[in-house]
């Protein structure tokens, strides 16, 4: 009997250790460089798409990625309400999308509806509070349509 109890305790402690090792995402969870994947997920989940259009050399883009996008309130809001995609506008499909969307500076942040129609956008670095306001504005515009 004592052996069974010991075995059960070992099993539960192993499971507890596993549960504690599962880590929540650190910031906004982005699909990387795949507009078509984001569009598909948005249609399936009936969510809007938040696009971070960036360039690898862009200082404000790096600041957004390393600070604002990692803010816990920003991450919770965007992960709950949007399909998030980060696209390097100078690689892969990026140049064609930059031309199609009229992007002229980085970072450019754009919200699209689930069908790929632009709702709103902005350029430049934003702090956490301003980015959440931007996201809420986008959701209110889409709700009004």
Where are these regions (language model features)?
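Bacterial Sec-dependent N-terminal signal peptides
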Residues: 1-21
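Thiol-based oxidoreductase modules, predominantly thioredoxin-like and allied folds used
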Residues: 29-33, 53, 64-93
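A short beta-strand-turn-helix
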Residues: 30-47, 78
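Short active-site neighborhood of thiol/selenol oxidoreductases, capturing the structured segment around
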Residues: 44-59
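Loop/turn elements at helix/coil->beta-strand transitions in domains of secreted/extracellular proteins
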Residues: 45-49, 80-83, 113-118, 129
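The canonical Cys-X-X-Cys-His
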Residues: 58-61, 109
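Structural alpha/beta surface segment adjacent to cysteine/selenocysteine redox centers
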Residues: 92-106, 110
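Non-catalytic, surface beta->alpha helical segment in thiol-disulfide oxidoreductase systems
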Residues: 104-144
């Amino acid at each position: 009997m004592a052996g069974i109890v010991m075995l059960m305790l070992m099993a539960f402690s192993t499971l507890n250790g596993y549960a504690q090792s599962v880590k929540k995402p650190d910031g906004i969870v982005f699909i990387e460089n795949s507009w078509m994947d984001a569009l598909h997920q948005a249609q399936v989940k009936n969510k809007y798409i938040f696009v971070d259009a960036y360039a690898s050399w862009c200082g404000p883009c790096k600041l957004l990625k390393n600070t604002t996008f990692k803010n816990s309130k920003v991450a919770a809001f965007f992960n709950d309400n949007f399909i998030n995609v980060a696209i390097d506008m100078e690689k892969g499909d990026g140049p064609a999308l930059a031309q199609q969307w009229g992007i002229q500076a980085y970072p450019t942040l754009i919200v699209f509806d689930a069908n790929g129609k632009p709702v709103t956008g902005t350029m430049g670095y934003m702090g956490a509070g301003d980015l959440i306001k931007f996201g809420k504005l986008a959701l209110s515009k889409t709700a009004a349509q």
